[in-house]
């Protein structure tokens, strides 16, 4: 019930946003960062405390590698709207990227205490525990989440990361494969397999990745993951020119 209520609140929140912010989100979805950034900055000049605009601008900053700016924007957004759980989650993720693990843990603890049945926030807590080196505890939490949501690709991928770091590559591979079986356009799962540096993709998996890149609705982050995974897979097959092409395309989007 709590998860459904949270989802309903988020839907109502999105419906309440100005049309211009929804439009900027669509532009960002298409990977047009420069255009989205300009429009977002112009909007913030008129409404400097709009937390959704700050959140969008932080996403752009994060994609461009300006994590300090992203953190600053989200910290202020959370201060302006402390009850917005999604803002806190985004703030937590940026803190993690900046390796500010103690601050990230505080945000995870707050979210889990405030929304004890929210599986997404529980997964964020597991990731923070993993970052602190307690891989067994993190895997236990991921497993508890998967009992309730067995096909959640993000949790399966995160569990794979924990298993990999814990030195259990075979179970990690299984977890990554379950993730991309559950959601074929989940590029991170394929990239994670490539990132093992020991995995050999099957021909069918290479074909699947190429087909996913033909999907015009594929998220830009997933597109990057697929290009990089294909670069690894094709290089291993001796298709060096095609592999380099995918590497270039991935870097262009990134």
Give residue spans per PLM region.
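Alpha-helical solenoid repeat scaffolds of the TPR/TPR-like class and their adjacent stem/linker regions
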Residues: 1-254
